[in-house]
């Protein structure tokens, strides 16, 4: 799988609220580092491992009662996507960047700003 395809699947999982499919995009030891939460006064989220990613999104989608509203998705290039996401009613501009994929096309590290 190429990076652009992985980004498209990431956005689809975020929009549908599918924590299992989202976690399946990550390597067993994959890292998700999200500093976009600072924009709404929350701490940076750093997750290591596919299981941690799945559990966190299961929790987030549950508390949110479904997927996070995402709009205005723009692919900046094959490794980065920009979008607006609503965190509890607050609209935030976010960039998600895949820093590295493994040999199987799974995410080794994704940074969200």
What are these regions (language model features)?
Residues 55-113:
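A beta-strand edge to alpha-helix "cap/lid" segment located at domain peripheries
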Residues 1-18:
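Short, aromatic-enriched amphipathic alpha-helices that serve as compact interaction elements
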Residues 10, 22-23, 30, 49, ...:
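Hydrophobic pocket/interface hotspot
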Residues 2, 52, 91:
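Soluble or luminal CAZymes and related metallo-dependent hydrolases
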Residues 27-72:
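A solvent-exposed, acidic/Ser-Thr-rich amphipathic alpha-helical stretch
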